[in-house]
Regions:
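Non-transmembrane "mature" sequence context
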Residues: 1-110
Length: 110
């Protein structure tokens, strides 16, 4: 897996000019996926745009959760290259391939 930068809740709050509680709400509502890294809640930086969470992420995160993926598993799947997509699913989402990513994610449930 390609090395990615991770941001803590305070990092994200500062970057988006919101409170840490608003960042935690984004995580609770699955606009962002977070994982504990060395005991600290962190989010892959690639899940954010300059304006906020990557808009395509939430629906994909909900689909993965409905398919039985825990947050750590969903994050791993999003960040690791996928043979059927040719790139990591998060990179395909950023490139505008939302429907294709979600089809692949949906197939994982079966």
């Amino acid at each position: 897996m390609e090395k990615r930068t991770w941001l803590t809740v305070p990092d994200i709050a500062e970057r988006l000019d919101v409170s840490p509680s608003q960042v935690r709400r984004l995580i609770e509502d699955r606009h962002l996926l977070a994982s504990r890294r060395d005991g600290v809640v962190s989010v892959p930086e690639v899940f954010l745009t300059d304006e906020g969470p990557l808009p395509e992420l939430r629906g994909t995160a909900i689909l993965l959760g409905d398919s039985g993926f825990e947050n750590d598993e969903a994050i791993r799947w999003l960040l690791e290259p996928d043979d059927s997509l040719g790139v990591a699913p998060i990179d395909a989402l950023i490139a505008g391939r939302k429907a294709e990513v979600r089809r692949v994610a949906q197939a994982l449930a079966f």
